């Protein structure tokens, strides 16, 4: 498909799952994923409250890629503090990543990509960025779980 070929949300997120399985190291390919309402996909490695998310903000024309902390207030604060302490390491691999408190006591470590519409070009960019986020952040998240 050409770069400008428009994709329905279902096609886009199905394609993103397939691309991630192809791009991720073998040890990170066995994620659980679910579509959220609208233009949203979440994936995780056994803790759904700490999940990676791809979310198309249609009004802003942006696609958010990131790691969301949506557990208890205590868990979210622990995760926020842990990743704040690792931001130099994170920024070395994900230079546009931002860590911020968010809605309902949640927080997120994310960036946005231009996405006026969902097409093959956005899918390619999203797959690269999301694979980078997972490969960079999941080992850190695994360390957080051990502490």
Predicted regions and their residues:
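Charged, low-complexity intrinsically disordered regions
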Residues: 90-147
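Polar low-complexity intrinsically disordered regions
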Residues: 1-3, 146-147
């Amino acid at each position: 498909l050409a770069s400008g070929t428009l994709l329905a949300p279902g096609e886009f997120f199905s394609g993103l799952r397939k691309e991630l399985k192809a791009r991720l190291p073998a040890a990170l390919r066995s994620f659980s994923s679910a579509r959220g309402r609208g233009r949203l996909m979440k994936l995780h490695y056994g803790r759904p409250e700490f999940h990676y998310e791809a979310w198309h903000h249609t009004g802003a024309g942006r696609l958010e890629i990131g790691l969301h902390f949506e557990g208890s207030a205590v868990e979210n604060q622990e995760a926020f503090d842990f990743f704040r302490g690792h931001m130099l390491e994170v920024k070395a691999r994900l230079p546009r990543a931002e860590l911020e408190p968010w809605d309902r006591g949640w927080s997120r470590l994310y960036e946005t990509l231009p996405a006026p519409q969902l097409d093959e070009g956005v899918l390619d960019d999203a797959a690269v960025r999301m694979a980078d986020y997972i490969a960079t952040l999941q080992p850190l998240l695994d360390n957080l779980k051990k502490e």
